[in-house]
Amino acid sequence: MSKIAQLTQILERLDSGEDPVKVKAEAKRFLSSITPQDLAVAEQKLLENGLDPAELQKLCSLHLELLEDQTYRMKMFLPPDHIVAILLGEHETILCFLDDLDFVNQSIQKMDGYKPYRNEFRRLLHIADQLVNAELHHQKEEELLFPQLEKHGLFGPPMVMRDEHTQIRRHKHRLFELANNVSKMDFDDFLTQLDEVVAFLMPMLRDHIFRENNIIYPTALELVDDEQVWTQLKEDCDRIGYCCFRPNN
C-alpha cells in the first residue's frame, strides 16, 4: 500500500469517529515519515472519494494531531522577504491581536455597564480595526499562494481555507460593528454578542493559522521549486500590500 493510501486510510478512521490520540499511537512510526504535502494530497484524495467539503473542514483540526509544528523550521531557512516568511510574520501579529482580544473581552465581560472612559473599549476598537485590515493577508493567500497549490492539482485544502476566510471575515466585521456601536446598544446585549463573536473567532482563527503554517505553506514550498515563481509572487505581494507587518526589504 502506498504512503498516500495508508494516510488516507488513517484519515478515514478519524472521519469514522476514532480517537485521534489512539490512531496516532497505533500509527506512530508511519506518521513520523509523513510530510505536510502527504497530508494535503490525502485530504484531496478524500474529496475525490466523495467526502463532503464541509466534513473535510471539520476533520482538518483532527488532522493536525498528525503533524508537528513546522513554523520554526520554515523561519530558519526562509529569507525575510520571501512571501511565506511575510505571511508567517503576519500570522504572528494576528495571533498577538487575538491574545489581546481574549484579555479585553474577559475584562469587559466583568463590567456592569458601558463606561466610555475605560481603556478596554478603545483597545477593542483598535483590535477590531487591525483584524479587519488583515484582509490584505487573506488576499495574498487567495490570489497568490492558493493558486500555486491548485496548479499542482491540490484543490481541497485551499477550498477549505477560502471557506474559512469567508466565515472569519464575517465575524471580524461583526466585531468591528460591535466595537463601534457599544455606546448605542443595550449593554447586556452587547456583552452577549461580543462573547459570541470572540468565542467563534478565537479557536477558528488560531486553528486556521496553525493549519496554514503546517499544511498549506510547507506544501507550497515543496511543490513550487522555481525561484522565478517565488520572485514573481513577492512582486505581486508588494503590489497587494501589507497589514500589521512589513518586511525589511
What are the residue ranges of the model-derived segments?
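Small-residue-biased structural context
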Residues: 1-135, 139-249
